[in-house]
């Protein structure tokens, strides 16, 4: 036994000496530090050679390359396990979504992004302690309302983008209802994500399977609380975006190279879970910020030609089983026009991918609220209008302005007629003088087609007034029904005859 150990030591020493000479001939170390590094490397290689984990040849470069390749394979196996773990994917999704929002937003003294690090579970535990009439004592209310909107000199929040996913379960409905109250009080729309489980699905890839989405909500008792939430006034301040969008290309030499080592991420075009996705609420947040930066209003946030497009999405192509090449849909699933209309009708904001391109579009921007139906057609039309986010953003901003204006006017000597005249002159700054002929750019900067303000005295309370603002925004095209007819004469020609 002792002789075997002696022979092993002698063999190791001989191997180290020979390989040291090979490396010195190849690399030619010029300093003592370099020679020491070579000696240390040789010792490590010799130990691995004796364990029969590697084979050393006379070609030093080839031996080292083989060793590095073996290390890269081991690292790749471990990194793949980390990258595709559920906890890591959730963490990466949050950071890449936030990076998408910040990188695509041009901030300045008027457009600011503030980040609050609070998990959905933590927020639910907190809001649960302030249920009922105590909701206005919650930390969220104080943060969003009191510290900004309700504070002299405060800067009201224009929108809240939350990296959460909600479904119809009682805890989610309870939390969403509490948040909606705060958002409505502060006139700050709340945009977040919808989970596929809200439609009883494991993944959004199942979205094409149901024949009728509306029946899921109307013929299932599980959605009683959800439908009740949709019927509230506060629900108009909630927007649920879906599905997720691709946050990055898979790592690989031909897709997303890694400089540190040779790494190929283990992905499969058919395996949805092995990709990195981000919340669609971030994409909607980018559109909202872009509209505000360009026009000062958040009205152009939906539609292909009106600010709803999300550009430069990662596009990953992969070989198919039949020998062809396919592209992974960067929005989880391609949504048809019919399905998009169904989703909007049921209170969602779908992100629709344009086929064979790297961009997608928010066609609609419907809030969670289900518009009420009245006997009066005008009242029903008003309800439909107030349930759409582009119009709500404009009204919310006017609410922010008005609170600041009224706060500054307190104590001034103003009669009712003076207040009414002043408000009407002020509101006309945001009314398009010629809405029938003005450009889309003008409509975006002046979001109102007409406006009127009425100020009334409050009986029994001198110095107090009640102001009513009537705002008519520019209507955005929601749909167009086309009929084709074969005729011998055009209607205009027949009328002329």
Please place each PLM-identified region on the residue numbering:
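N-terminal-proximal low-complexity accessory segments that begin disordered
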Residues: 1-121, 125-128
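Long, contiguous, structured domain-core segments that constitute the functional module of a protein
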Residues: 261-422, 482
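Generic, well-ordered alpha-helical scaffold segments in large soluble proteins
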Residues: 74, 78, 94-101, 182, ...
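Long, charged, glycine-rich C-terminal linkers/tails
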Residues: 93-98, 109-120, 435-458
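Short, hydrophobic/π-rich interface segment
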Residues: 418-438, 442-444
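Extended, regular secondary-structure scaffolds
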Residues: 133, 148-330
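Core mixed alpha/beta domains of very large multi-subunit molecular machines
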Residues: 95-114, 124-154, 171-180
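C-terminal edge-of-domain segments
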Residues: 452-497
């Amino acid at each position: 036994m002792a002789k075997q150990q002696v022979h092993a030591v002698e063999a190791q020493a001989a191997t180290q000496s020979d390989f040291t000479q090979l490396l010195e001939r190849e690399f030619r170390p010029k300093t003592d530090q370099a020679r020491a590094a070579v000696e240390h490397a040789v010792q490590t290689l010799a130990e691995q050679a004796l364990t029969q984990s590697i084979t050393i040849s006379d070609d030093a470069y080839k031996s080292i390359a083989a060793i590095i390749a073996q290390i890269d394979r081991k690292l790749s196996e471990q990194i793949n396990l980390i990258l595709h773990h559920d906890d890591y994917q959730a963490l990466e999704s949050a950071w890449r979504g936030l990076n998408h929002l910040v990188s695509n937003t041009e901030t300045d003294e008027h457009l600011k992004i503030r980040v609050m690090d609070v998990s959905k579970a933590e927020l639910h535990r907190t809001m649960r302690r302030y249920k009922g009439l105590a909701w206005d004592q919650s930390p969220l209310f104080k943060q969003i309302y009191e510290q900004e909107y309700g504070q002299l000199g405060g800067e009201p929040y224009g929108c809240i983008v939350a990296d959460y996913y909600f479904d119809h379960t009682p805890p989610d409905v309870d939390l969403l209802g509490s948040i909606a109250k705060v958002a409505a009080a502060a006139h700050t729309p709340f945009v977040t994500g919808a989970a596929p489980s809200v439609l009883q699905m494991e993944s959004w890839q199942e979205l094409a399977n149901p024949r009728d989405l509306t029946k899921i909500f109307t013929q299932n008792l599980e959605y009683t609380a959800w439908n009740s939430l949709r019927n509230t006034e506060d629900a108009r301040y909630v927007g649920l975006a879906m599905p997720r969008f691709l946050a990055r290309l898979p790592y690989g030499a031909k897709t997303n190279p890694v400089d540190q080592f040779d790494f190929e991420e283990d992905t499969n075009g058919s395996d949805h879970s092995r990709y990195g996705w981000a919340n669609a609420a971030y994409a909607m947040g980018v559109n909202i910020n872009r509209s505000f930066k360009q026009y000062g209003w958040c009205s152009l946030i939906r539609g292909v030609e009106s600010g709803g497009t999300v550009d430069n999405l990662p596009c990953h192509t992969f070989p198919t089983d039949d020998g062809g090449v396919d592209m992974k849909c960067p929005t989880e699933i391609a949504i048809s026009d019919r399905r998009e209309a169904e989703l909007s009708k049921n209170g969602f904001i779908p992100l629709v991918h344009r086929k064979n391109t790297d961009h997608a579009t928010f066609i609609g921007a419907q809030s969670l609220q289900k518009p009420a139906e009245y006997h009066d057609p005008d009242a029903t039309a008003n309800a439909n209008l107030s349930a759409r986010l582009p119009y709500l953003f404009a009204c919310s901003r006017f609410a922010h302005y008005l609170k600041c204006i009224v706060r500054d006017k307190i104590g001034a000597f103003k009669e009712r007629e003076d207040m009414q005249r002043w408000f009407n002159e002020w509101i006309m700054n945001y009314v398009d003088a010629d809405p029938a002929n003005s450009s889309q750019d003008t409509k975006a900067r002046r979001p109102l087609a007409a406006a009127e303000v009425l100020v009334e005295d409050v009986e029994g309370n001198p110095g107090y007034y009640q102001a009513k603002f009537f705002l008519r925004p520019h209507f955005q095209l929601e749909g167009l029904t086309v009929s084709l007819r074969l005729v011998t004469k055009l209607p205009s020609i027949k009328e002329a005859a």
